[in-house]
Amino acid sequence: MKSFRLFFGLCFTCFLYFFSSCSEEPIYNDLSNIDNNIDTLLITDISGYNYQISPDISGYNKLFVGSKEEFTFLSSLFNFPSNSWDTFFDSTVTVDSIFFKVFSGDSLIENNPNLNLYFSTDSIFDESNSLVSELRNVAYDEWVNVGIPSVEVVIDTSDTISTFQETVLKWDIGSLVETIIDTLTLHRTFSLSLPSGSSSFFELYSREYSSGSLDPKIEVYYRREIGSNPDSSVVDTLTRIIYVSEDISVIETLEIDDNGNNNILISRARGSRAILNIPFDSLSLPQYSVIRSANLSLFQHGDSLDNFSVRMDPLKFLPDSGSSIFNADPYENLGLYFSSAKVASNKLQISLKSYFQSVLMTDSLTNVGLKFSASTTNDLFESVNFDLNHVNNKLEIFYVSP
């Protein structure tokens, strides 16, 4: 038994010595012979063309009515929800007054502006799906004309210096109260528009502008009787605010002028977008290459519009159409690998790395073209123009190949 323990102890000691000796000696490998080549692919054969759709201006933080520069806004439309009116369908409730309100950052709006409010119980538009081109021909003959608003300029006097806050445009819609609070009314649609020939212009806050305080709204002032005995019942005076659920401005579409040879214009208010063709496919780089960067640089002549944001979407397919003017956009996005960048110093530099790496790796993915459009964060009236003949335009790809 003792000899067995002695033998076990000697073996264990040898194991510890061997392990400690191994752990103290670092392992060296020569990595200098790995056969990776860092290289560059430069593509300058970049072509493209413009196309135009019905302007997509939904979701913008402002609403417009009237003419500004070359743009004309025929109206602004408002939808209110159908599920906020049960409170008033109660025998104990009496509506005292009801108002439609919109807000503006313009302190110079005069009293009695010629901005007319109309009301309809029809479903006129859907902010997400309606095309502006389909809303231009809305006839107001069968709408109820509510009239013009009262105007109140709100000034903050809490400090020693008075500060302008906002302008409130308010319409008394008491004549519509029975229809509006009726739970059988499915749609409550309003429109703001100017008389024909008016040169006025109004800029209002949309529901996207704030978290609620400056949203278009309906304010209802009402009383509720508490208690069954008329002689001893208590009357509560209350206010209910119903915020707009959808709003959109209707703009007249401006056709794109001849933009010059091989120039592309990107503009949200014009509905102007562009398709770019870049000769890149799965055979453009050696097999199993890894792209480190792939930056497309486009230049423009003249003054730069800094901070204009451009979005790139790879296309799923090219539509079979010889037209360049459409209502809806026929160029369907792939839905993946999109990117965006801002113009700076006459130059747009935007990454295509994610998309082109996938083109290399995915057999079923083919580069059929790239869509360029204005990001929704841009000022609605701004646009950017790129010269596809510019000598500095290029796609520069840095890659590693085995």
Predicted regions and their residues:
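Secreted, disulfide-rich extracellular signaling modules
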Residues: 2-6, 12, 19-402
